Amino acid sequence: MKSIGDNLKLFRLRCNLSLTDAGSKVGFSAPGLLKYERNKVNHSLDKLNKLADIYNVTLDDILRVDDTASIKFTNLRVGTSVSEAKIEKIKSLIQNKVDNYFELLNKSNIKLVNKFGVHIINTVNEAESLATKLRIFFQIPINEPIYNLIYLLEQHDIIVLTLDKSSVTEGFIGFYENINNIPVIIVPKEDDGYSQRFNVAKFLGELLIISNESNKSNLTDTFALSLLVPTKSLINEFGENRKKINFEEIDIFSKVYRVSYKNIIKKLEISNIITSSNAKYLNIYINKENKKEQYFMEEALNYNKMLYKLNALDIISDVSSYL
């Protein structure tokens, strides 16, 4: 169960306030507020109301102590320079987001089912084969693009969430875990929809693949690329062996398949459609000419869809505490 203290800590971290800063606003020392957050003392309604004002939430938000999901956080990915204090803040944001999602599912009377399981994968060919099998499961032909990956995963009971960019989430790369036996993927909101889309595909691979190999990351990269850009689709578009490829061909393929220029070139090289020197030349040209992909962005929609429907049905009166 979540506690009042857990909520106080979460809301303080959301506001990016230290114990000293928050405590000084209500006449608490840092140790005094820490006792409140650790539920070591009885909570005064007067103090809780003042803290609610500081944190820009309601008293009901602070008093809401529904069940909390058990999260291991073993697959939290952050940059090497991210401090332990910031990691704890990111964990609190993830915990709150996941708890809210499962609460919305419960209030909506929706039951998710894990349809995927795990797969023992030890070679690049096996990783590519798994991506092909998943496309068959999704009923997407091997030579057609996946137009909206996040929507597709949400339609198959995978929870996908995003964290807004802020000083708190700076350095957050992503998170993936089976929670309550449901696959959960969380990524930062990106300016670039291409890297976000690739990371969602890669983290899906991390959830599905069990490997004896030390370089599992290489297998999940292969899985992600193969899911988004099957080798057959490349051969259909570019042919089996090319001495030269114009950048405009790459650009057109990127617009259709929504994959970055560099990942298309990487896949062309891996598939032996172009040589390493051709790949190097194309990448140099893209960097030199500062070529940019056509803008697009995918959004996770199920969370807000449930939230605003429950609000319209008067089951949830205040949506702000869930945002």
Feature locations, PLM:
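Active-site hotspot residues in diverse enzymes, especially metal/ion-binding acidic/histidine motifs
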Residues: M1-L323
